[in-house]
């Protein structure tokens, strides 16, 4: 049976440099994390700020702290009814697939608000 691993959301530790963030997560005893760059890394205001150099520095910081990045979190709204808005949000997610690969993240996550419920006609 696989080992049970407990992780934490990175942004629950505040906004920091990658080194500071992963050191804090590791010291708190967590083996893995969900990383949402726009919520957890200083200086990242949009996904355009996540450069290949930043992704590599993030991976190195996580490795040094003994923390794996289980989820590359992209907090975008994928349930917009307006197709142009939805496409813009999907583009943000797609831009992060190469980053997830660098981070060795097992999956990518997002968050959908109750806006999705308005699309269901009961």
Task: Please describe what each predicted stretch is.
Residues 1-107:
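N-terminal pre-domain/capping segments
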Residues 103-117:
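Mobile beta-alpha loop/short-helix "lid" or hinge segments that flank ligand
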Residues 120-122:
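Conserved small/polar residues in nucleotide/adenosyl-binding loops
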């Amino acid at each position: 049976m696989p080992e049970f691993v407990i992780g934490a959301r990175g942004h629950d530790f505040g906004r920091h440099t990658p080194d500071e963030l992963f050191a804090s997560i590791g010291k708190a005893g967590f083996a893995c994390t969900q990383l949402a760059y726009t919520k957890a890394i200083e200086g990242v205001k949009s996904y355009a700020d996540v450069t290949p150099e930043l992704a590599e520095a993030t991976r190195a910081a996580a490795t040094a702290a003994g923390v794996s990045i289980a989820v590359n979190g992209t907090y975008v709204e994928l349930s917009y009814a307006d197709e142009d808005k939805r496409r813009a949000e999907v583009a943000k997610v797609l831009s992060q697939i190469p980053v997830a690969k660098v981070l060795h993240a097992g999956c990518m996550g997002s968050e959908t608000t109750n806006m999705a419920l308005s699309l269901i006609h009961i």
